Amino acid sequence: MADRELFYLTHAGLTAWRWHDAAVHELARFTDGEAGIDAFSAHLAQHPQARCTLVADLADEAFHLETLPLLRGRDRRHLIARRQAQLHLDTPYVAHQSLGRDSGNPRSERLLIAALTRPPSLRPWLAAIAQAPTVLTGIHSTALLGMAVQRQLRPRPPRALLVHTTPAGLRISCFEHDLLRFSRLVPGLSPSTVGFWQSCRDEILRTSQYLIGQRALERGGATPVQVLAHPDQHAILRAACPDSPDLRFIPLDLPELARRCGLRSPPDSSDSLPLLLHLAV
C-alpha cells in the first residue's frame, strides 16, 4: 500500500503523521489558531498529491440510539436521513451504524447515530486541505475506530467497556457485541499525570453509573473493563482499580495488541494513538 498522511485533530491543534510499510511516524505539529493553520497549509504545499485521512479526537460528540422500522435500500436511507434531520444535530459530520434487529420487535432495527457536534473545530483544517493538491480519503473519529480495536480483543464479552488514552485524554467506550453504544472523551487526563489511574477509575465509575441508568449496562453485572496500557503500568493499574460488583478491570498489553494488528512501530507507552492511526489506514 502507498504511503499515507494521517492528520490527528484535537482541540489543541493538529499533528501530521506518515504511515509507511505498516509503521507510523510523526511529521509535524500545528497549534490551533491562524498561525497553525498557515503552517499546515505550507506543509500541504510541500506534499502535493498526498493521500490523507483526518482522525478527529474531540470531546464534542453526540450518540443517539434509535429504533426504526426495518427497511431496505432507498426507503431505509431516506428514513435514516429524515431521523438525523429531526435530531437537529446541526453538523455535517454524522455517521450511523446498525446495531441489528430489536430483540423485542424483529421488525425494527436499532441504529446508533454518531456526530461530531462542533463543526468549527474541523472547518479551518478541512478548508486548508480543500485548497491544497491533496486527496482527502476520509474522516474518522477515534470513538468509531474503537470498534476495530474491540474486534481484535480475545475474549470478547457480549458487553464491555474499552478504555484507552491518547494525547487528547482518556476515552471510555461501551460496546455491545463488538458494536459501539457510547463513547466519552475526558480531556487532559494523561498517564504522566500524578494519580492518573485513580482518576481513570473515578471517570470509569462515573461513566458506568450513567450507562447503568441508560440500561446499557447491568447493575451488579461485573462488566469487563478492558484497559489498553503498557505492561509497565499494569501493576499500578491493578492497585488503583480494584474490581467491584459492577466492574471487573482487565489490563491489556497495548504493544502486543498493536503488533497483532500488524503495526510495525508498536507504542512504547500507554498512548494508543499509533494503533488507532494504523487502523484508520
Question: For each predicted feature, which ranges?
Answer:
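Hydrophobic/aromatic-enriched cytosolic interaction surfaces used to assemble or bind macromolecules
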Residues: M1-V281
